[in-house]
Regions:
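Extracytoplasmic gate region of multi-pass secondary transporters
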Residues: 20-21, 196-240
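Helix-breaking motifs and short loop linkers at transmembrane-helix boundaries and internal kinks
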Residues: 32, 64, 85-90, 258, ...
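Helix-loop-helix hairpin linking two adjacent transmembrane segments in secondary transporters
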Residues: 129-173
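C-terminal transmembrane helical hairpin of 12-TM major facilitator-type secondary transporters
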Residues: 260-305
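Cytoplasmic helix-loop-helix junction between adjacent transmembrane helices
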Residues: 95-132
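Conserved MFS/SLC helix-loop-helix module at the cytosolic interface between two early adjacent transmembrane helices
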Residues: 51-87
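A late C-terminal transmembrane helix in Major Facilitator Superfamily
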Residues: 315-344
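Residue-level signature of mid-helix packing/kink "hotspots" within the transmembrane helices
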Residues: 18, 46-54, 138-139, 240-244, ...
Length: 378
């Protein structure tokens, strides 16, 4: 019951999380601000939601993780759901920063609980299920936000909050979840930032940087090629759907083949597929198949890295989950602004080709990670 409940909360948490970007034009009109000022809302939510995740995990490893896993999505839902209710921009900025803290608390504690309460021989599958549930929410977020706000106004978003509030209340009715024995100390926390977990983080960050840059640049690249908006939307949908399926498949395969084998294997195949994306004609319909294969392969390692980190640090599962999830994506995302300037200066292909080289050290880091004995069914 607990993994399924957490998967639902992940779907709804990330559904609400993805309300903000598509509604920026409406918020700009409401508050009379420009895009640069409105972008502060995105920055406030993203920074607290991503970069605070290891520290949210540090807290979750010391208190009742069930409480934090329930509180986090409630903060996100109330923050995003109330965007049409605040009279001042500054108030909304503070509320969304607080919502980001909620997202950080949920991802770290939720992934930790799923990894610990799933059957050990199926840990990879359940972490994949948890991850793909979040991807589903991210995909639906813009559709739901634009439909509700377009039909009934920004204020109507608040009526969606029971999607989170009711399951969160149900989670609170379950028994408390605290670690037995002595909690991890500060020296244990510092150990996470070196050794095998640090190698996993480095690998995941390099991989995220390459593919975040590619997927973010894709609409601009297509536009320079004269491809239609419809084909661009189709390509992004194919990539998003294949990423979700890849997440689900990756953890499941790692239960059978081993975590390290899946990580190294996906990176080994990922580089030639990535090069194919850069040099194969994007207007060819077969390009969509290549895009789907690459999207699935490069996202398959996300839950696998989390599962392996939890097995390497069983006393700090929330901390390492936060490090390998939001902190990885947030850290990689910080680099996209300078990458965008490089693309403007030198062109899409040279910059994306240069970024592809980063998959080689990512592969080497994955090869260097120690896999605990018998991760399949420990």
């Amino acid at each position: 019951v607990l993994p399924l409940l957490l998967a639902w909360l992940h779907t709804t948490n990330d559904l609400f999380s993805n309300f903000l970007t598509p509604l920026l034009p409406k918020l700009m009109d409401r508050f009379g601000v420009g895009l640069g000022t409105a972008g502060l809302l995105v920055s406030a939510y993203s920074l607290t939601g991503s970069l605070l995740q290891p520290f949210a995990g540090l807290l979750a490893d010391r208190v009742d993780r069930r409480l934090l896993a329930a509180l986090g999505p409630v903060l996100v839902a109330l923050g995003m759901g109330s965007m049409g209710l605040w009279p001042r921009f500054e108030a909304l900025l503070f509320v969304l920063a607080l919502a980001g803290v909620g997202s950080a608390l949920f991802h770290a504690s939720g992934a930790s609980l799923v990894g610990e309460y799933a059957p050990k021989e199926r840990r990879g599958f359940w972490l994949s299920f948890f991850g793909s549930a979040g991807n589903l929410g991210l995909s639906l977020g813009p559709i739901v936000a634009l439909y509700v706000a377009g039909r009934w106004g920004l204020e109507a978003l608040f009526w969606l909050t029971p999607l989170v509030l009711l399951p969160a209340l149900f989670l609170l009715r379950l028994p408390p979840v605290r670690r037995a024995g002595r909690p991890a100390g500060f020296r244990d926390f510092l150990r996470v930032f070196r050794g095998d977990v640090a190698r996993l983080w480095g690998m995941a960050t390099l991989r995220s940087l390459v593919f975040l840059s590619f997927s973010t640049t894709l609409p601009y690249w297509y536009a320079t090629k004269g491809l239609s908006d419809g084909y661009t939307a189709l390509s992004l949908s194919v990539y998003s759907l294949s990423a979700t399926l890849g997440i689900l498949a990756g953890g499941t395969l790692s239960d059978r083949l081993g975590r390290k084998a899946v990580l190294v294997g996906t990176l080994t195949l990922g580089l030639p597929l990535y090069l194919g994306l850069l040099f194969f004609p994007a207007e060819n319909p077969l390009y969509l198949l290549l895009l789907a294969a690459t999207g699935a392969l490069m996202n398959a390692g996300i839950p696998v890295a989390v599962a392996l980190a939890q097995e390497l640090e069983p006393g700090q599962t929330a901390t390492v989950s936060g490090l390998l999830m939001g902190f990885t994506w947030g850290f990689a995302g910080l680099f996209y602004a300078p990458i965008g300037r490089l693309i403007e200066a030198f062109g899409v292909l040279p910059v994306l080709l240069g970024l592809g080289v980063l998959l080689l050290p990512a592969w080497a880091l994955a090869r260097g990670v120690r896999e605990p004995a018998r991760t399949m069914g420990v």
